[in-house]
Amino acid sequence: MTEPLLTMRGIVKDFDGVKALDGIDLTVRPGECVGLCGENGAGKSTLMKVLSGVHPHGTWDGEIHWEGAPLVASGVRDTERAGIVIIHQELMLVPELSVAENIFLGNEITLPGGRMHYAAMVRRAHELLRELRIDAINVARPVMDYGGGHQQLIEIAKALNKRAKLLILDEPSSSLTAAETQGLLDIVRDLKRRGVACVYISHKLEEVEAVCDTVTVIRDGRHVATEPMRALSTERIIAMMVGREIRNLYPREPHEIGDVVLEARNVTCHDVTNPRRKRVDDVSFSVRRGEILGVAGLVGAGRTELMQAIFGAYPGACAASVLMNGRPLAIRSPADAIRAGIAMVPEDRKRHGIVPQLGVGHNITLSVLQRFATRGRIDAAAELDAIRAGMQRLSVRAAHPFLPIAGLSGGNQQKAVLTKMLLTDPQVLILDEPTRGVDVGAKAEIYRLVFALARRGVALVVVSSELAEVLGLADRVLVIGEGEVCGDFVNDGLTQEQILAAALKSRRRRAEPTAASAT
């Protein structure tokens, strides 16, 4: 067996007296991919921040050995010079700069006199992308011209330009399509063959199984186990992550479905940058009291834009007729929607769901502050009671209610956003990608909440790119393709293949006579 490239022993990290890491061990060998698994808040990101120099030497206890020698890093620059490079879940690219400029950001090739040698950077950027077998990216174009999948590959090229020996990938596929994810996994396999080591952090255990040689599981800041992937099952990894076995991820129980509560008619949304293009084209649907409506479709199909239009949050021009309990609504903003009894947990919680500078508690009560106001003053005690009750209800983990929400894990941020929306007492709750970047334990909690709300008579609209999630939750499935309704199915024996087949159809294609109908 080859000597370890990296050895971390007994890593301890405190935040204001709260132990985020409590004696964590991690070993990585050249050309090995180690899966780092744990629930949200388990300490995965904190451990990687220690390793990558975000938390410099001296701010934590323990030992790190790199290539057989102690690693003493005062910052990210030191670890990158050593060959340790992290690619964060939120990509660190400058949209307005070219691909080549992003790849060399902070490591520019310069001419005598200090001017950038742009031609040399373009040549080297081409070489790096060729090494990754990528030919669909023009290095002279701005990064903003490319989607999430290509941007992830640009980040990997940027890491290789820093001569990475160990690549840390933090939730690398959270915003990728299935095809883009497969391409990413192929590149990870290729990097392993070239001797580059990887630490792969993902809640998608099928990806961990596909590329990882070893799995290290941590829970509540402690090391649980390190085992070869071949000796593990998905069920065993989950049990180690959460400390218990999750037998039924979708605890479906009978619930009564009542009358139509929300009806959307002829929803049309125009593209923000190209108003002649329609992102949503004349879509109509309804949802009943106590019903869980799943909304499926390919990435870019217009699902999010449709939900934003109903919630009064679409940034471009749109037209729609929205009725609540048979009465027309005039929704011009999210505040109008909330007053009408419609709440929404957005797809991008960091941009649209939280105020990062505020504490967890103040984020939770942001939509209902008037409830605690008397003569212009907030009843702080009543507000705190509501915050604590909400956090307890959804098991939001935070050292104290007014810790900045930006410091929470993704899963706890998501549960805080859910808590905020539930405080509005909605009749209709829209959940757009509710479990993106969320661990399996938090997923199970969110699913239990969805079914509990349905039993209480709340109408739920769940938008998800995970077809297993749609089929596990929904009573009925609406399929959107190219901004149009491609199918509306009762979830009784419905399959993923049927949903995908519907998503790939356009209205024009459906209108054409088939060979069977022509005979």
UniProtKB/Swiss-Prot annotation:
| Residue intervals of the ABC transporter domain | 6-245, 262-507
State one Pfam family annotation: ABC_tran
Q: Which GO terms describe its molecular function?
A: ABC-type D-xylose transporter activity; ATP binding; ATP hydrolysis activity
Localization per record? Cell inner membrane
The cross-references to InterPro entries, in alphabetical order and at most eight, read: AAA+_ATPase, ABC_carbohydrate_import_ATPase, ABC_transporter-like_ATP-bd, ABC_transptr_XylG, P-loop_NTPase
Kindly report the protein's main subcellular placement as a broad class. membrane
Keywords of the record: ATP-binding, Cell inner membrane, Cell membrane, Membrane, Nucleotide-binding, Repeat, Sugar transport, Translocase, Transport
Topology versus the membrane, per the UniProt entry?
Peripheral membrane protein
What catalytic activity is recorded?
A: D-xylose(out) + ATP + H2O = D-xylose(in) + ADP + phosphate + H(+)
Q: What is its EC number?
A: 7.5.2.10
| PROSITE patterns membership | ABC_TRANSPORTER_2, XYLG
Gene Ontology CC annotations of this record? plasma membrane
**Family affiliation:** Belongs to the ABC transporter superfamily. Xylose importer (TC 3.A.1.2.4) family.
Task: Give the multimer and partner information.
Answer: The complex is composed of two ATP-binding proteins (XylG), two transmembrane proteins (XylH) and a solute-binding protein (XylF).
Q: What is this protein called?
A: Xylose import ATP-binding protein XylG
Species in which this protein is naturally found: Burkholderia thailandensis (strain ATCC 700388 / DSM 13276 / CCUG 48851 / CIP 106301 / E264)
